[in-house]
């Protein structure tokens, strides 16, 4: 084993080329590796929703929830089944084992629901089974506030949607706040009777004509008949000429018995935006989703650049509000890692400058970036991504990986005095410390390796922690024993400068002081007892801190954010207009909140980050509140303050 590390020392040209190649490839992989907020973990969860109009919460649970829950609980690979029942709505959530195939699990869930249908009340709605994918959340939410008629606003949203979907890495774009184009046919009742026609004949004629645009309703005597189909006729102006065969056999054109109205569908959602405290105005809200494995920082940056370019054309005069940007959050995490890494390098250099000299401090500090570039290669090659879990692992590893480099550097520094030659000092240091360093690293590896065997969703979620740390530790050994000695030879000088002599003298004084302190500690039993008692007392005190709640225990503590969400859910069947009144009442509160910069309101949909996973319906609304950069309250405190302000004015959930 010693010969392997000494080989790197002897073959200097090879080692230099290897360091250059690893650095180049590592920097490339750092740019190329996908970046996202969290690991893409497929959690096999299905939700069964069923409605029963007019039923109370207890009746809903008894008549629907319990019967579906009993069938679902008997499925294979079920981990947990939870349910909730409220007025007219039943929700049953089935979480399968983490190892289960999600598609097969959802199919089994649908089969179980089908078996339960026969026991449900006849007036209950058909149960709806939804597959939950927590990774399928928007990476960018943008609202465009512009003063345009409803029709033009819809055309603008279609254009923006097409522009954004053309960007590499974008999987889909959902739009809120627009109204679809729709044609209504108002039938003249007298004409219908005169020609002996029925509504079904009109529908059949339209279907035969292959109309390819949405026809919302056929209205006869204030009764609406909703219809939809697709075909080859793509202009509403062609509809009046469609022929219908009357009872007498004579052809009748649609214009003779009905009026064709080319208009817009009834709105299913509203969207508004308020910027810098100004009154909210109509807007369209676009939620951008990324493809699996896409680089979230690049995708969101490309979308924002596309919108910036469009301000010169289709978005001229429009106000663009970015209410959520996951790419910016990930980029911030990367900046934090870089800052922490640089701070660690500087601290290591400072400590080593004060102890063994400035040359040695540079040598030891270089082991950090070299180990990191090797780690990036490993992450990229293994299919991992840069996310907050892998970033946490890298930050955690910084303080561990530098130890090996410090040991080798200090050993070479000490042995230069006895061996005279820096190369011989490096060889002697490798022979003496190679196995102890490898053994020490393996003990640390043994601490993290069991995390590979952690089962369930948590095990999948944190799988990159042991992989990243163990890979970095192995990289640190390669760097410390294979590269640091060669770098140390370059920086080590047999004849020291006057500054280095002063440094050496200072270092010796520190060592002498510590030896004297340690000698006094070891020579007096009373001093030892006092020291050990203080250490034991501090240990017990540290253990008591979480027990008494002085130190909180959280799996992933929440940090300060630049935005908060307000979710509104009224009773089942609440019209969109009534929910809009609740949303406007909340908006009035937001105008008065000193920490609010802007907000975006969407009525008719819940947030993509809510428990309902972006569901739609007249009873739902959500408001994304963008907080000011300079504020006295953090996001948690702002959220609590908003709850207090909103509670008196809402009877909604």
Please give the residue ranges for each predicted region.
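Signature of alpha-helical transmembrane segments and their immediate interfacial
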Residues: 1-35, 433, 500-554
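Transmembrane helices with small-residue packing motifs
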Residues: 13, 20-56, 114-123, 380, ...
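Surface-exposed amphipathic alpha-helical segments in non-transmembrane regions
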Residues: 16, 23, 28-32, 63-80, ...
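Hydrophobic transmembrane alpha-helices and their membrane-interface caps
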Residues: 26-32, 319, 346-414, 471
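Small-residue-enriched core segments of transmembrane alpha-helices in multipass membrane transport
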Residues: 46, 109, 350, 361-383, ...
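Juxtamembrane "pre-transmembrane" interface segments
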Residues: 174-178, 186, 256, 280-350, ...
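Helix-loop junctions and hydrophobic alpha-helical segments within the transmembrane domains
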Residues: 323, 330, 334, 409, ...
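Transmembrane alpha-helices and their membrane-interface boundaries in multi-pass membrane transporters
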Residues: 398-412, 433-453, 460-501, 623
């Amino acid at each position: 084993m010693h010969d392997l590390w000494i080989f790197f020392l002897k073959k200097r040209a090879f080692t230099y080329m290897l360091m250059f190649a690893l650095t180049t490839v590592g920097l490339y992989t750092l740019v190329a590796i996908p970046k996202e907020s969290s690991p893409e973990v497929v959690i096999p969860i299905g939700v069964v929703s069923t409605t029963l109009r007019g039923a109370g919460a207890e009746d809903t649970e008894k008549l629907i929830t319990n019967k579906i829950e009993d069938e679902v609980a008997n499925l294979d690979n079920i981990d947990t089944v939870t349910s909730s029942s409220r007025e007219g709505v039943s929700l049953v959530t089935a979480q399968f084992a983490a190892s289960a195939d999600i598609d097969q699990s959802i199919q089994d869930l649908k089969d179980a629901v089908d078996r339960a249908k026969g026991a449900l009340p006849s007036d209950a709605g058909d149960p709806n089974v939804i597959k939950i994918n927590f990774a399928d959340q928007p990476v960018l939410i943008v609202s465009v506030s512009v003063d345009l008629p409803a029709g033009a606003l819809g055309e603008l949203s279609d254009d923006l949607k097409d522009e954004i979907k053309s960007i590499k890495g974008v999987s889909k774009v959902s739009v809120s706040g627009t109204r679809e184009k729709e044609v209504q046919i108002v039938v003249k009742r007298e004409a219908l009777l005169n020609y002996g026609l029925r509504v079904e004949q009109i529908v059949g004629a339209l279907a035969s004509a292959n109309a390819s645009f949405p026809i919302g309703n056929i209205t006869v005597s204030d009764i609406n008949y909703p219809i939809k189909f697709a075909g080859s006729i793509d202009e509403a102006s062609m509809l009046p000429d469609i022929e219908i065969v009357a009872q007498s056999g004579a052809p009748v054109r649609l214009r003779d018995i009905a009026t064709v109205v080319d208009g817009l569908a009834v709105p299913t959602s509203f969207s508004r935006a308020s910027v810098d405290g100004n009154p909210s105005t109509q807007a369209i809200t676009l939620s951008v989703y990324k493809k699996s494995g896409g680089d979230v920082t690049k995708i969101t940056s490309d979308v924002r650049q596309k919108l910036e370019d469009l301000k010169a054309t289709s978005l001229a005069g429009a106000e663009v509000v970015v209410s959520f940007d996951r790419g910016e959050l990930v980029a911030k995490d990367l900046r934090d890692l870089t800052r922490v890494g640089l701070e660690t390098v500087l601290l290591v250099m400072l400590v080593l400058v004060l102890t063994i000299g400035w040359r040695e401090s540079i040598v030891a500090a270089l082991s950090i970036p070299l180990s990191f570039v090797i780690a990036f290669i490993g992450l990229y090659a293994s299919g991992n991504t840069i996310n907050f879990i892998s970033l946490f692992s890298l930050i955690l590893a910084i303080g561990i990986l530098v130890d090996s480099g410090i040991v080798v550097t200090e050993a070479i520094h000490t042995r230069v005095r006895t061996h005279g030659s820096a190369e011989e000092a490096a060889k002697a240091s490798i022979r003496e410390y190679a196995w102890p360093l490898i053994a020490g690293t393996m003990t640390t590896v043994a601490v993290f390796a069991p995390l590979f065997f952690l089962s369930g969703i948590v095990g999948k979620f944190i799988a990159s922690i042991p992989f990243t740390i163990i890979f970095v530790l192995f990289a640190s050994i390669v760097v410390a024993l294979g590269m640091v000695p060669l770098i140390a030879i370059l920086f080590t000088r047999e004849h020291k400068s006057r500054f280095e002599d002063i440094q050496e003298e200072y270092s010796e004084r520190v060592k002498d002081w510590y030896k004297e302190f340690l000698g006094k500690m070891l020579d007096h039993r009373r001093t030892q007892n006092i020291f050990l008692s203080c250490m034991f007392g501090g240990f017990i005190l540290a253990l008591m801190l979480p027990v008494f709640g002085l130190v909180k225990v959280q799996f992933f503590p929440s940090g300060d954010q630049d935005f908060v969400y307000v979710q509104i859910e009224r009773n089942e069947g609440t019209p969109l207009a009534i929910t809009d009144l609740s949303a406007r009442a909340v908006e009035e509160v937001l105008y008065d909140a000193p920490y609010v910069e802007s907000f975006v309101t969407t009525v008719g949909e819940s947030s993509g980050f809510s428990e309902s996973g972006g569901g739609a319906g007249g009873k739902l609304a959500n408001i994304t509140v963008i907080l000011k950069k300079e504020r006295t309250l953090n996001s948690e405190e702002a959220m609590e303050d908003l709850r207090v302000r909103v509670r008196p004015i809402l009877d909604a959930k």
